[in-house]
Regions:
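Hydrophobic alpha-helical membrane context
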Residues: 14-17, 158, 209, 306
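Short, intrinsically disordered/low-complexity patches at protein termini
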Residues: 17, 193, 203, 218-219, ...
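N-terminal pre-catalytic segment of deacetylase/amide-hydrolase enzymes
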Residues: 20-144, 150-156, 163, 309-310, ...
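A generic local structural motif
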Residues: 2, 128-130, 276-280
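Sec-dependent N-terminal signal peptides of Gram-positive bacterial secreted proteins and lipoproteins
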Residues: 4-23
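Catalytic grooves of carbohydrate-active enzymes
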Residues: 285-322
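Basic side chains
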Residues: 2-5, 235, 312
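Metal-dependent polysaccharide deacetylase catalytic core of the NodB/CE4 family, i.e.
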Residues: 97-99, 139-141, 151-158, 162-292, ...
Length: 327
């Protein structure tokens, strides 16, 4: 009788352990198959808005290892370009005074006078730089993003752009490109521009002409070697430039891309919701606008589709920077 009780107890323990094991396996299976789950959402307690929450890339999506001659896009690697620096000592005396770019807040479907003056200054002085399309007769818009680092929303942005068939330019630093090659390859293969935002994101007016060229060339070399890609569009880190810097960028074959529409979207501690992003951007749109958004902003990622739809309803046409008129 005692032996029967012991056997029953042992059988009960085995059944309990088996049930626990199956439960744990189910939890693990749930964690390892995020594709079967809907994208998580979060509700902003201040506004009551529900927004999508970006999830981190799974381990299997991390940076692959390239073999000799391969690129992340499958395109053939491009030959490296030697940037010959004209007047490396700036003997011509071009101003090296730091200018913090200012564009003004556009209202009423017209660019702010500051943006108009900026474009006139670039054109009148022969700089290969632009912030505003004053030539096209269409209501053109040029959508650009600054991508200093990855915050999990670039994939959502690319999905929206693909759905809406809208071209964009992504100005990336070298660490962003090195750490997220799949995202960069997707940008390129889906027809977007990957712009040059420098290697280390320094303030260009503090650099020599040779150092400026090295910052641009380092990024260009990496894109050519690892992605078989190069486009001559540059954006100054922090929007800080000088006459000397503008001249240098143009002298090595690049065009400096500024903007006429933007807002304070980069501060992750001060995101104000999808509706705020939509209202702010649409209120500032105007024909010929170069729009600057930051890819780290969840508000931008969630509002982008609505912004595009609204703009098109108003007769705007989205174009690539490759279509921007020569100044």
């Amino acid at each position: 009788m005692k032996r029967i009780r012991i056997c029953c107890l042992l059988l009960l323990c085995i059944l309990l352990c088996s049930a626990c094991g199956n439960s744990a396996a189910g939890d693990n299976a749930r964690q390892l198959n995020p594709a079967t789950e809907t994208q998580p959402e979060a509700t902003d307690p201040a506004t009551g808005e529900t927004t999508l929450v970006a999830t981190p890339l799974p381990v299997t999506a991390q940076k692959p290892v390239l073999q000799n001659g391969e690129t992340y896009t499958g395109l053939p690697a491009l030959a490296l370009q030697d940037f010959a620096v004209e007047d490396p000592e700036n003997t011509s005396g071009l101003s090296t005074e730091k200018v913090g770019y200012s564009y003004g807040v556009a209202k009423g479907g017209a660019p702010h006078e500051t943006s108009v003056q900026n474009q006139s200054y670039f054109s009148e002085n022969g700089y290969q730089a632009f912030c505003l399309d004053t030539v096209s007769e269409e209501k053109t818009l040029y959508l650009t993003f600054d991508c200093g680092y990855e915050n999990g929303y670039t994939e959502m942005i690319l999905d929206t752009l693909k759905e809406k068939n809208v071209p964009a330019a992504f100005f990336c630093t070298l660490p962003q490109v090195e750490d997220n090659p799949q995202l960069i390859a997707r940008m390129i293969t889906e027809g977007h521009i990957v712009g040059n935002h420098s290697v280390k994101h320094p303030s260009f007016p503090t650099l020599t002409r040779i150092e400026m060229a090295q910052e641009i060339q380092g990024m260009d070399d990496y894109l050519r070697t690892n992605f078989g890609y190069s486009e001559p569009f540059f954006r100054f880190p922090m929007g800080e430039y000088s006459d000397c810097a503008l001249d240098l960028v143009g002298s090595i074959g690049y065009r400096s891309v500024f903007w006429s529409v933007a807002y304070e979207d980069w501060d992750l501690d001060n995101q104000r919701g999808t509706q705020y992003a939509f209202d702010t951007v649409t209120a500032r749109l105007h024909p010929g606008a170069v729009i600057l958004l930051h890819s780290v902003s969840p508000d931008n990622a969630n509002a982008l589709g609505q912004i595009i739809d609204w703009a098109r309803e108003q007769g705007y046409v989205f174009k690539s920077l490759c279509d921007f008129p020569q100044t």
